[in-house]
Amino acid sequence: MKVLSDKQNEALEKMKNLAAELGSEAAACKQAGISQSVYTAVKKGTYTGDVDKQLAKVIDYFATKEAAAVLYAGTGYVPTTISSDVQKVIRNCQLQGGLAIACGDAGIGKTEACKEYSRQHSTTCVYVTVNPCIKSAKAVLELIGAQINVSSGSVSRLWLDITAKLSDGMVIIIDEAQHLTYKTIESLRSICDHFDAKGQTLGIAFVGNETTVNQLGGKQKAEFAQIRNRTKNTRIYSSKKVQRSDIELLFPDLVNDVPALEFMLRIAQSSQAVRGAVNLYSNAHDNGNVTHKGLVAMAKYMDMAV
């Protein structure tokens, strides 16, 4: 039986604590990147492979997490002008039923608004994010189904099971909706129609960049225009609409540093958007200098156009 070093024993103790935190040893092993069977054998002293190599994975995992813990972690959700308005669009969509669109520049708070709305309305909201690989009707229905415990099947079976599982007054948020195909949007719209026919409401909010309303589908642009005309609310947002008050909420430490605040507002209103401003502040914070001079220097280091 191999004698473990103090560092290796410490890693095993951290794994034990992580398992207690996550609720199972299996979850802890998956998160730390080590096979559960290997971990169990190492603990028991029966592992016949390279123990040092396996425990190095665990040691490196916790070292990475501990190093990351001291970095700037952000302020969590911040109700900026734009993110608050996106939430209003989603709320009205849920109350009225039917389709709604909230789109605009990347990095201005749309996704954070969706996540926050989903957290606040977890029992009546289904939130999914699509991507270039998940955009077909079946793939998106499977994504929605996974959120409400509907098993995969044919497109028709998925549609029927999902409509049976959803209930009056719910809302589905589709983030990164610019990736959706016309057929997928029609499949989703038909869910709204199904509830409307029963005298009930089901809202679907499409959230994404501006192509969500003016470029989706390429050659099928006219068909998407017809869908847009059937939406009850369409909002288009721009980084240029970011307010000084938003910057004060996002970076409260800068409230008394007017030059720094104005500089961050310029960044947020540019193509860098709010996300770029947050990244800049994060790097400057970790570098130990969030003064105006420090922020400008970091922006230059990051090759930001300012």
Where are these regions (language model features)?
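Walker A/P-loop nucleotide-binding motif
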Residues: 95-116, 132-133
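Conserved adenine-nucleotide phosphate-binding loops and their immediately adjacent elements
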Residues: 66-80
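Sensor-1/coupling segment of RecA-like P-loop NTPase cores
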Residues: 104-106, 180, 195-223
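C-terminal alpha-helical "lid" subdomain
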Residues: 1-60, 226, 233, 240-306
